[in-house]
């Protein structure tokens, strides 16, 4: 599983294809504007001003290694096929071949021996006012037939070099992304259907071809251009389907990635919530659209250590703050008018600099990346990787509010006494606590034997924290029954003691069984089965399609993360000894504020932060 999975390619192949296509798309967007070497100019300005730390990443405006522009001679076309801006001309049905109308770059990838390996059609985004008139015919498709002359030459070049349509990438950014989606829509008829099996990647596209097996569409939730006209039949229909004031309706499609936030300076500012998310609000609503051309957020998503747990629509927050705001702004899944995913599991990804990252109310994944980061956990079962640098993990309360465990590989677990979720941490060197302000500047050091207190100038007053004892599983399939156990990898079977246990399955498809005491069950990553029993039990399925088994002894069970991650399909299976029919189950279920409570006799279940209809839809009664 991966956010950028596409067609039948492996996850690694999909990532390479997508990130390459994105680079090609942004290159075409900035290259040769007004006939100037603007791609080189952008790189020079970035190197002189931005790349020293002002911008959140090193801007790379050039082509990926091995790629070059293909000339008219390469494609057996006359020199007039390219305009004075160095772009291939596509005639507009309205403006004809007017300079800076519809354009494209045709690019080739060559191996070390000089052999052509792939070809790309990268449609150009808006680079002059001439393009504006073509916005109004994207949905109706009048432009599609005019692509045929150039695409015919591309087809012939591909075949002449022994390649096929599956060796072709079709991409573009902004308007260029819209043209890539338009070509995808007409792939069966253009040039005899040759490009039906090409690889289509739309970047920040206003138009959406909603065919997930054909096109991968990527953009940012806080980019007003992305999905603005959707897949409506005409631009008039798109306006009618949108919100008043030309506000982006934030529609979802099967081919789009829908919950990614580029957390930039504008998104962090008060202006974000005070002004409309309208296509007409260029200074505010277009900020991420422009930022997306230069950001390396796509690479940071793909390279983060939690990528394998991400689904197509996982809530993803990517730090993209400048040096002006980076040191004073917490990057988080914030509650705002442009978001409908607040409270879901979020993947929060830092930059190469010193970031402030903060978890929310769900079980989040936080990755610092390079730099000396401060990472603050939230209310759920969070997982943290500090990355490179000297990173500080900040926890709620005081050190006395936590039990701390350390595994043989250095992984830390922090179990909160107040039941706000287990925190897993890797790659962090320091620990601080919200209620111990001295620890903010003099944090505890993580050592092999415990947390070393540095708050006092006199070591006699130190309150070092020793690690608690726990049983650690192997990378295989373990069967364990102890007080505190961390299963690690493998498909484990973990059983609680009668006195109560802390069970953590780790990665893999695990079975966790509660006992007669008060238990905390954490399935973590994988498709897990969690069995509730007597006592006060807290069940966290984690990322994956988890099953919660509920028998008659479950007298005080709390499911803490039901379908919390986008893409999860959790289920509740009730024993027939509890409810004899779905009608009886429905009669016992009630919405109580944000939770669902199911109670009958001694049986009592609370599904936190859930809707009654969703819980009942995901429930079944079983025998055995």
Which residue stretches match the model-derived regions?
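Gly/Ala-rich beta-loop-alpha elbow adjacent to hydrolase catalytic centers
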Residues: 172-176, 180
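Low-complexity acidic/polar repeat-biased segments
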Residues: 418-469, 585-624
């Amino acid at each position: 599983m991966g956010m950028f999975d596409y067609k039948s390619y492996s996850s690694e192949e999909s990532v390479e294809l997508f990130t390459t296509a994105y680079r090609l798309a942004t290159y075409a967007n900035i290259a040769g504007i007004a006939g100037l070497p603007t791609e080189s100019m952008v790189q020079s300005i970035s190197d002189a001003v931005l790349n020293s730390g002002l911008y959140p990443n090193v801007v790379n405006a050039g082509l990926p290694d091995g790629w070059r522009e293909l000339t008219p001679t390469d494609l057996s076309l006359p020199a007039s096929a390219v305009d004075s801006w160095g772009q291939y001309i596509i005639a507009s049905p309205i403006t004809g071949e007017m300079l800076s109308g519809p354009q494209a770059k045709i690019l080739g990838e060559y191996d070390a021996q000089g052999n052509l390996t792939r070809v790309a059609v990268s449609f150009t985004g808006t680079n002059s006012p001439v393009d504006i008139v073509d916005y109004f015919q994207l949905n109706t498709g009048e432009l599609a037939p005019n692509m045929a002359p150039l695409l015919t030459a591309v087809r012939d070049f591909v075949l002449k070099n022994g390649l096929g349509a599956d060796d072709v990438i079709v991409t573009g950014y902004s308007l260029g992304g819209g043209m890539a989606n338009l070509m995808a829509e007409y792939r069966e008829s253009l040039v005899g259907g040759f490009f039906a099996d090409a690889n289509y990647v739309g970047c920040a596209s206003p138009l959406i071809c909603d065919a997930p097996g054909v096109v991968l569409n990527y953009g940012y939730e806080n980019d007003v251009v992305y999905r603005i006209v959707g897949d409506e039949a005409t631009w008039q229909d798109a306006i009618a389907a949108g919100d008043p004031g030309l506000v982006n309706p934030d529609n979802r499609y099967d081919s789009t990635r829908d919950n990614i936030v580029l957390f930039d300076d504008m998104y962090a500012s008060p202006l974000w919530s005070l002004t409309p998310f309208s296509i007409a609000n260029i200074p505010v609503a277009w900020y991420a659209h422009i930022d997306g051309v230069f950001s390396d957020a796509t690479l940071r998503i793909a390279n983060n250590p939690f990528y394998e747990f991400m689904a197509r629509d996982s809530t993803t927050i990517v730090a993209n703050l400048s040096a002006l705001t980076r040191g004073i702004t917490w990057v988080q899944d914030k509650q705002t008018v442009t978001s409908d995913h607040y409270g879901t599991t979020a993947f929060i990804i830092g930059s190469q600099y010193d970031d402030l990252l903060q978890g929310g109310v769900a079980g989040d994944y936080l990755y610092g990346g390079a730099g000396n980061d401060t990472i603050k956990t939230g209310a759920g079962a969070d997982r943290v990787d500090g990355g490179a640098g000297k990173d500080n993990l900040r926890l709620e309360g005081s050190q006395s509010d936590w039990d701390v465990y350390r595994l043989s590989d250095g992984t830390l677990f922090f179990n909160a006494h107040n039941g706000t979720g287990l925190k897993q941490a890797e790659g962090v060197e320091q620990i601080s606590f919200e209620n111990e302000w001295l620890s903010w500047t003099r944090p505890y050091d993580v050592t092999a034997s415990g947390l070393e207190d540095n708050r006092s100038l006199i070591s006699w007053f130190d309150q070092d924290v020793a690690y608690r004892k726990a049983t650690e599983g192997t990378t295989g399939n373990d069967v364990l029954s102890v007080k505190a156990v961390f299963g690690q990898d493998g498909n484990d079977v973990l059983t609680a003691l009668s006195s109560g246990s802390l069970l953590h399955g780790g990665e893999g498809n695990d079975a966790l069984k509660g006992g007669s005491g008060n238990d905390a069950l954490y399935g973590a990553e994988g498709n897990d089965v969690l069995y509730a029993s007597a006592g006060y039990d807290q069940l966290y399925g984690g990322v994956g399609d988890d099953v919660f088994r509920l028998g008659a002894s479950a007298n005080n069970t709390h499911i803490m993360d039901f379908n919390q991650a986008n893409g999860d399909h959790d289920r509740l299976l009730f024993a027939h000894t509890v409810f004899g029919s779905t009608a009886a189950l429905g009669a016992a279920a009630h919405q109580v504020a944000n939770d669902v409570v199911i109670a009958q006799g001694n049986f009592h279940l609370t599904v936190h932060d859930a809707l009654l209809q969703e819980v009942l839809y995901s429930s079944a009664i079983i025998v055995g």
